[in-house]
C-alpha cells in the first residue's frame, strides 16, 4: 500500500503508528469484562487502553492530521456500533453478521487506505482480515464446538434449536466456508503489488502454504 501511495514515507509511518496505537487501545478495552473479577485490575486495563488512545491522538494532533483523526474516529464509531450489535444479538441475518465482523476487523485499515489514496487496499484488508477471523472461528467450532460467531449463526439460522444436530452444524460450516471462499477469491482477484511476506501470509491463510513450501524446496 505504501509503495503506491503519494504520501511521504515519514508521514505514512506516522499514520500507521497512530492506527496501531488506536487498534491496541481497542483491543485493550476489549479485555475488560463484567464477570465480577478484581475491580482494580479492570480499572487498570481501562486506563491502559485510554493511554494508548491518548498517544494516538497526541501523535496525530501534533502533526496537524485532523482529517485522519476524524476518519479514525468514524472507524472507531463503526467498530463499536457493530460490537454492540453483536453483543446485544441484534443481527438478524448471517450475511449481516459477517459484514459486522468484517467492519470490526478492518475499519481502521480501510480508513488508512483511504488516507493513502489507495482504497483498493482497504478492500483487500477487509477480505483478508474477515477471512482470517472466519478461519479462526471455524477452527474453534470444529475443534471444541465453541465459537461466539457460530453461536450467533446458530441463533439466526436455527432459533428454536436448543442443541444443534450434526446436519445443522454441517450447514453452518458450509455457509462459513462459502464466505471464506468468497474472501479468498477477492484476494486473488485484487492483483495488487503485494510483497513477498504478504504473499506468504495470504497463501498460508488460503491453504496454499504447503504448496509454496514444496515448490520452494524443489526450486532451492
Swiss-Prot record:
Pfam family, one: HEPPP_synt_1
Designated gene of the protein: hepS
Gene3D superfamilies documented for this protein: 1.20.120.1450
Catalysed conversion reaction: 4 isopentenyl diphosphate + (2E,6E)-farnesyl diphosphate = all-trans-heptaprenyl diphosphate + 4 diphosphate
Record-listed E.C. numbers: 2.5.1.30
Function according to Swiss-Prot or TrEMBL: Supplies heptaprenyl diphosphate, the precursor for the side chain of the isoprenoid quinone menaquinone-7 (MQ-7).
GO MF terms, alphabetically ordered: heptaprenyl diphosphate synthase activity; transferase activity, transferring alkyl or aryl (other than methyl) groups
Record note on quaternary structure: Heterodimer of component I and II.
Keywords from the UniProt entry: Isoprene biosynthesis, Transferase
Protein name as it appears in the record: Heptaprenyl diphosphate synthase component 1
Native organism: Geobacillus stearothermophilus
Gene Ontology terms: biological process: isoprenoid biosynthetic process; menaquinone biosynthetic process
Amino acid at each position: 500500500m505504501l509503495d503506491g501511495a503519494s504520501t511521504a514515507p515519514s508521514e505514512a509511518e506516522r499514520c500507521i503508528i497512530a492506527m496501531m496505537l488506536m487498534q491496541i487501545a481497542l483491543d485493550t478495552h476489549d479485555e475488560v469484562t463484567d464477570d465480577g473479577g478484581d475491580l482494580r485490575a479492570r480499572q487498570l486495563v481501562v486506563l491502559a487502553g485510554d493511554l494508548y488512545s491518548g498517544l494516538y491522538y497526541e501523535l496525530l494532533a501534533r502533526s496537524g492530521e485532523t482529517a485522519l483523526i476524524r476518519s479514525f474516529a468514524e472507524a472507531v464509531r463503526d467498530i463499536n456500533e457493530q460490537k454492540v450489535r453483536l453483543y446485544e444479538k441484534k443481527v438478524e441475518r448471517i450475511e449481516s453478521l459477517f459484514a459486522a465482523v468484517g467492519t470490526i476487523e478492518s475499519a481502521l485499515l480501510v480508513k488508512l487506505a483511504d488516507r493513502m489514496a489507495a482504497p483498493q487496499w482497504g478492500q483487500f484488508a477487509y477480505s483478508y482480515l474477515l477471512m482470517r477471523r472466519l478461519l479462526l472461528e471455524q477452527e474453534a467450532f470444529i475443534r471444541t464446538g465453541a465459537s461466539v460467531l457460530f453461536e450467533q449463526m446458530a441463533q439466526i439460522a436455527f432459533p428454536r434449536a436448543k442443541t444443534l444436530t450434526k446436519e445443522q452444524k454441517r450447514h453452518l460450516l458450509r455457509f462459513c466456508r462459502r464466505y471464506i471462499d468468497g474472501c479468498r477469491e477477492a484476494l486473488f482477484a485484487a492483483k495488487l503489488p503485494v510483497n513477498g511476506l504478504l504473499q506468504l501470509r495470504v497463501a498460508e491463510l488460503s491453504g496454499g502454504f504447503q504448496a509454496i513450501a514444496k515448490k520452494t524446496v524443489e526450486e532451492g
